Swiss-Prot record:
Signal peptide: none annotated. Pfam families: LRR_9 (PF14580). This is Acidic leucine-rich nuclear phosphoprotein 32-related protein. InterPro entries: AN32 (IPR045081), Leu-rich_rpt (IPR001611), LRR_dom_sf (IPR032675). It comes from Arabidopsis thaliana. Belongs to the ANP32 family. It comes from the Eukaryota. Residues 232-242 have a biased composition (Polar residues).
């Protein structure tokens, strides 16, 4: 039996070898006393500096041969079968003894507690003992033990017992030990682990920038400007817009290739050299188109002035064919409604051979209307003239000295555009063309 107690004590020490340094020893339920006796005194008397001893729930019924522990302050004997024999605690010479826990034992009478009057007990716990059911139990116990302040963890007035100063000191010591251990584990070398290093801002030339989620203001504005330019150049309903406000569409199934902004003038001159009949439709401006036309208004005026200068210099076929005829305001949904009104009125106007003076006047009118309305133009290339040898680039500016018969022959040689093109004319264009037709008849009669 002694060996069993020795092994239980070794297990409770958890590897601690210095018996004199031990302050607390807990043997709750470690051994079941068959005869209800405590272990031999020699097993526990090795711990002379022991202050807290707990031997709860070991089945002890007698305190005979209780070890002599002069520094013992608190003894826990709860959940046992103790009835009498408390005098053995007095014989053990427990001079520092002040806290006794006898809860859930078999003490039945107040007289059995009389030996405890010789001890300097401050706290006594008899919870769940039969003696607690006696009448005037509390007052009688307080009257028996004069030094007693707390019975069953409450004072004589029923106030709960606060934690003792000793217990507070023990807890403070434990907290300090834990803090010291934490300081040893974290020496505070200033190192940053992976997560903190990833979140730390990068330093570059004295500037700190967040790696994720930061966008430069200039870069944001540049990206917005690029988006606006791309939207202006994006095709709408199968058509594409130039930067100068013109919208290009495919005519007769032919695709129109949009040149870069720098090559826009050269592209128009190529159209003139190939003798294509260019039909210009004035379209209604949307909000986005108005913005594009306003931004490029100055460029349009420069281009139109350059075209007028080319016409004054007498640039033959390219000058005559690059003139843009104002065909009136047109909407894509209204073309089918205007077919009957525009029949037979575009043949003479679209031949592209007119007097330079008339072209100059007509261009001035177009320029004035453009400035007033701020509307863009729809440029549609028409299928090329079949007979390049007959007309081609050989068409020269008509002078007043030329023979009228020769002028009529040149006009007869030019192919008349497809009648379907006349369907895209509009009422406004009809009025302008009537006036131009009357001026042409008067000029022919004078010649």
């Amino acid at each position: 039996m002694d060996e069993i107690w020795e092994r239980a004590v070794e297990a409770a020490l958890d590897g601690q070898t210095d018996r004199l340094a031990t302050r607390t020893l807990t043997l709750d339920g470690a051994v079941k006393c068959v005869q209800g006796r405590l272990p031999p005194p020699s097993v526990l008397e090795k711990f002379q500096n022991l202050q807290h001893l707990s031997v709860a729930n070991i089945g002890v019924s007698s305190l005979e041969q209780f070890p002599r522990l002069g520094n013992l302050q608190k003894l826990i004997l709860s959940d046992n079968r103790i009835t009498v024999g408390l005098e053995f605690l007095v014989e053990a010479g427990l001079d520092s003894f002040c806290d006794l826990d006898l809860s859930n034992n078999r003490i039945q009478f107040v007289e059995d507690l009389a030996p405890l009057a010789e001890l300097k007990l401050v706290s006594l716990d008899l919870y769940e003992c039969p003696v607690t059911r006696l009448k005037d139990y509390r007052s009688r116990v307080f009257g028996l033990i004069k030094t007693l302040k707390y019975l069953d963890k409450t004072d004589a007035e029923g106030n709960e017992r606060p934690e003792s100063d000793d217990e507070d000191d023990e807890e403070d010591e434990e907290d300090e030990e834990e803090e010291e251990e934490g300081d040893e584990e974290d020496p505070g070398s200033g190192e940053i682990d992976g997560d903190e290093r990833a979140e730390a801002p990068r330093m570059s030339n004295g500037h700190s920038e967040r790696v994720d989620g930061v966008v430069d203001v200039d870069e944001d504005e540049e990206s917005d400007a690029e988006d606006d330019e791309s939207e202006q150049a994006t095709g709408v309903n199968g058509t594409s817009y130039r930067a100068n406000g013109f919208r290009l569409e495919a005519v007769n199934g032919e695709e129109v290739r949009e040149d870069d902004g720098d090559d826009s003038e050269s592209g128009e001159e190529e159209v003139g050299e190939d003798n294509d009949v260019v039909e210009v439709h004035e379209i209604e401006d949307s909000e986005n188109e108005e913005d594009g036309v306003d931004d490029e208004e100055d460029d349009e005026e420069d281009e139109e002035e350059e075209e007028v200068d080319n016409a004054d210099r007498g640039l033959g076929g390219s000058g005559s064919t690059s003139r843009l005829m104002n065909a009136g305001e047109i909407d894509g949904h209204e073309q089918g409604d205007d077919d009957e009104d525009g029949d037979g009125e575009t043949g003479e106007d679209d031949q592209g051979v007119e007097d330079d003076g008339e072209f100059a006047d007509e261009d001035d009118d177009v320029e004035e209307e453009d400035e007033e309305s701020g509307e863009g133009y729809l440029v549609q290339p028409v299928s090329q003239v079949e007979d390049h040898d007959a007309v081609g680039n050989d068409i020269e500016p008509i002078n007043e000295d030329n023979d009228p018969d020769e002028e009529e022959e040149v006009e007869d040689d030019l192919p008349i555009p497809d009648q379907s093109l006349a369907s895209s004319s509009r009422p406004k264009r009809k009025r302008d063309d009537d006036d131009d037709g009357e001026d042409d008849d008067d000029d022919d009669e004078e010649r």
